Every structure is written in structure tokens, then in C-alpha cells.
Amino acid sequence: MKRMRDGSYTIKPTYKVGEHDIVPDMLAKRALLHPDQVAVEQRSSVGSTRSLTTSELQRQVEYTACGLIGLGVQAGDAVAILAPTSYEWLLLDLALLSIGAITVPIYESDSAAQIEHILTDAHVTRVFTATTQQAELVHSVAPDYTVSVDSFDRGAQRMIARAATGITIENVEQRRAAISSSDIATIIYTSGTTGNPKGVALTHANFVATAEGARQVLGEVIDSPETRLLLFLPVAHVLARLVMHVILSGQGVLGFSPSIKNLLPDIQAFKPSVLLVVPRVLEKVYNAASSKAGGGIKGRMFAWSAKQARTFSVASEKTFGPSLFKKMRHGIADALVLKKIRSVLGPNLRYIVSGGAPLATDLAHFYAGMGITLIQGYGLSETTGPIAVQHIGKNPVGGVGLPLPGNFIKIAKDGEILVRGQSVMPGYYHLPEQTAEVMPDGKWFHTGDLGSIDRKGQLTITGRKKELIVTAGGKNVSPEVLEDSLATHPLIANVIVVGDQRPYVGALFTLDADMLPDWLAKHGLPQCSPTEAAELPAVRESLEKAVERANKAVSRAESIRKFRIIDATFTVANGYVTPSMKLRRRKVITDYAHEIDALYGGPISAEAPKKRGLFGRGKKN
């Protein structure tokens, strides 16, 4: 760790990215060194396991690349993938990158409007989907120019195989040799606070440097012959995508769990040593364990054991560690409850990498107290995932780690986190003005997040300058997109979309007292006050329809699940809106916290801090 004259902190990288270092080379190098190592495992729908060695996977990548060339995919073409986390996704990604094409991920949950924007903005020429239904959705929103759409369940892989006829590995190598590390490898679209999402252009160098930086500080976790990582997060997410390539380029085995419904059976079969999760998954595991314990003696036993785990973890961070008494109580808790939860997560699990959203302190201490090493970090799509990450032995709960090697982090005078280095994007795709807004000097990327750095270089996130919501599941949500749609409803005077650190998106409405009389008369209802109207089934039904319409413009994960009508008015006089009638979001959230809590059945957590650890969160767009 080194502190620079400008106040930034950095760690010197041990790997220097070369002019022609590209993402597929990471696997190719491993295939040469360890051709017989198992690289990938995936369970089939009938429970059998498919395994491929590094040399077998490399041949599959080259063969698929031949087929893509045969289909007419050119260097620089943008090709989209709309599919679950799977071996097929990986294979297509590596093959596309091997011939100089650009991979454009599309979330399975993206709305038709979002897909249409991505296809148009990135000038996508071909789309591969998992299902016919997805292919039909893409066809329905495809722009006027021709976009080829192929689905795996309609024989896309066989089509690629047929197209490979007459194309040789030499053709692939010629394409590969022409690729520069500075070429764009992918365009990732992140949710923004206004308008359509911007495309984050990331280069091969971004991925290679970030992967090597992660390996430098977390080698024992992600680059060991004992490493087994089960990937179930969407690989459209930058962190999952990065980790996928990191594991493949190391010595470990990568597994896939395409459906969250089969996650626990997949964990039991794969026996991971490390899991990459978002906090919502950890919450579900905890809640499921608590629910299974139920009430009575078992419920009290679980609550007591969970408390001992948290207490033990907190004490372990102290200079002298936990006392003998705490160790004894922890041992009892482990025998009664904790080891049973660990067994659900697999006998080999040693590490959990949590990213994408903040993780509550009490939940972090619970898992740490179970004997699992919890690793958190901070980053955005614009930084190829992690720009800061905790090191083993230097991972206090609440912090998000040290700068990833090859990157610099400093705090601006207003508290904003500024970053630069090998992991930072060159810019937004074809948007120089918007790029200049976040990189005004062409070097330092302004994250929009607030934080602090201690004397050891440990970064702590304290808040956000921008209003982007990050749900407990790690999904970025633009509240304005929904609010602008809902504000057109005649009954709605004000709306605020909420959901930060919550399991789903919600909204608070205030009724328009001026418009209400006409609306009631139009619908044949007696005149009443806004307070009384809030109780009318017809009013609620009308608002439900408005919410359904607004939700059509966003993905399922961004959709409003619940709303409340509150008895309030937001005016300039009472400080809830500005003179230009913009909502003072933080004031509303603070003053109406009880109404927000009511949407979710209570506060986030009595012990949950305001600190945030974010891997791969998209910046304001």
C-alpha cells in the first residue's frame, strides 16, 4: 500500500498488461500449462454432471469461434446474449472475444423497452437467446435494420457447428492476432437515474488487469487447485462475468447453477469452496434457517446461536480476540445450530464473496461467526467490478477493502470517492459528453459515492451523492423512470419510489386534492377528503393499474411490488420540494421512514449500518 502526494492510495500491480493481452488468452495459457485440469462442471436437468478439462474447453471455444466466423460475425460486431448463467453463455462469450467481436449482455429480466434500447444503441447485429420465447421478444422490438436472432432451444448450437465447416483454427488465430488489449470487449448497460441506461464500454485490458489484480490479492481464494466456485448470479452482471473469467484463468473449477430454484441441490452436488453472492441470498439463507427453526425451544435455540455467532465475530476483530467464555458459548452454538447451516452450504465452503449491494453488519457478523471468511469490496460497472477489495486477514466488517492493484482511490473535498487506473472504463459507448461529466479531467472517475479512507488505506462507503436505488438483491433501480410515469396519473400529487437495501421496490403516493373531486364525480363516487379517498377500493384499483403500466418500462426486478397512500402534501413551504418542484428525496425518506418501514414490515435492521459495500454497482447515467 502506498499513499501518493495527491492523497490517493494504491497498490503496485505485479502483472503488466501487454499490447495484445486479451480475455481469451487467460484460458488459453492455462490450457497450455494444465491441459488435463478440470475447468468447468455443470449439472444437467436430470442430475448428471458434465465436466470439461481446460484443453477440451479451449477446443470448444475455438470450434465455436470458427462457427461464428462462418456465420459472418466480423471484428467489431456487437453480438448480444440473452440467456441464464450457463456453460453456453461462457462458450459464446469466449468465442466472440476470440474473433474481435463485442459481447453485449442482456438480463433475462430486462423489459422490452430496455432490450430495444440496447439493440439500437449498441448497433447489435446478432442475438443469441436461450429460449424461443426470448427470441420472439427480441424480434418484436428489434430495430428496422436486420438483427439475426437464434435460440439455443431451436438449434443455435447446431447451426454454429454447421457454419464452422471450411473455417480453420488458423482463421481464428488471424482474427485473434489482430485484437488489441485496448479494443472494446463488452458493452454493459447499467440502470441510470434518468432516461435510458448508458453503455459502459470495457476493454480487454480492463478485464485482464482487474482479473490479475484480484488474483494478486485473493490468490488463495480464487486461484488454487482447491478452488471451486459455483456461479449462479447473472453473468450479465459485470462482477459475475469477471469472476467467471478469473476462475477459468486460474487453477480452480467453475460450476454453473442456471436456476435459483435448483441452487441448494446444485450446491450439495458441486460442493463449492467459494460462493459469489448478493446480500439478498445471504438474507434468504438466514431467514430460511430461522423459519425452519420455528417457535418454541428450537426457535429460541436458533436465536441464541445466531447471537453467539455475531458476538464471537465482533470479539474476533478485537486485539485480544474472544474470551474463553465466549469461545465456549460459540462452541455450543456451533454444535447445536451453526454447523447445520454450514452443511447446507456445502462441506468445502470456506469463503463468501458478497457484492452488488450493501450487506448489513449483523448479517456479516453472523456468517463470519459461522467460520466462513466473508470478503466484501466496492466497485461499479464502470470499474469492471471491484475497484477495492478486502484482503484475507484484513477484512473487518463494515469496510470494503484496499485499492485493487493497478488502481488509485482518493476522496474529494466534498467526500466523493474518485478512482482511476487499469480497471476504469475508457468511457460510455459513443457518449463523449456524458463521459466528460464523470471524468472531467480525463483521468479521475467521479463515482457519485461518498466515503472515507483510514490511515491504512481501508475504504469505507458512507453514502451516495446520487439517488440510484440498489435493492438487497443488488439490482440498480432508477426511481425517476417509474416516478415520471406515475406522476401523470390524475390522482397522484407526489410519488417517491423507495427500495434501497430492501428486498423489492415500493412507492409512497400522496393524493391530489385539487384533482380528486373531478375524479370522484367521473367515477360516480361521493365526494370525500384525500384521507377518506385513500381507503376507497376504486382509488387503490386505479393506482394499481397505474403501477402496472409504469412497470412495463422496467425489468421485473425494478418493478414496484407494493405501495402506500400517505396522508401528506409535499410543498416548497414545508421543504419537501424545491422551487423547481423537484422532490427532496432524502428529506422525504427521513421524515416518512415509518411509512417506508410499513411497506416492508419493519426497518432494514436495528443493527444495520449506513455503510455500504458495493461490487459492480452501475453509476448514475
Regions found by a protein language model. Give the residues of each.
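Conserved pre-ATP/AMP-binding loop-to-beta segment of ANL
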Residues: 35-38, 167-189, 196, 222-228
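ANL superfamily adenylate-forming
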Residues: 46, 133-181, 289-340
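Conserved AMP-binding A3 loop
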Residues: 50-55, 185-211
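Structural core segment of the AMP-binding/adenylate-forming
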Residues: 71, 98-163, 167-169, 174, ...
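Conserved ATP-binding/catalytic segment of the ANL
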Residues: 403-412, 416-471, 488
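Conserved AMP-binding/adenylation subdomain of ANL enzymes
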Residues: 208-228, 235-338, 348
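Conserved AMP-binding/adenylate-forming core of the ANL superfamily
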Residues: 36-94, 111-116, 204-205
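Conserved ATP-dependent adenylate/AMP-binding module captured primarily in the ANL superfamily
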Residues: 108-140, 210-230, 260-274, 489
